[in-house]
């Protein structure tokens, strides 16, 4: 596993922290697009979902809208 893949959950957390609030959200597709564009990380919907679940397990409050 390369360093970018290891950092992916942190990049997701950073995006959510900087770009979302009660009135603004990011979709998984938008997160995937930004990971590719900004960090050169190609990933799947399931992987991003797993990253979000892991961040929630750490106690980071992330609201998921189905």
Regions found by a protein language model. Give the residues of each.
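Short, basic/aromatic recognition patches that contact phosphate-bearing ligands
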Residues: 1-66
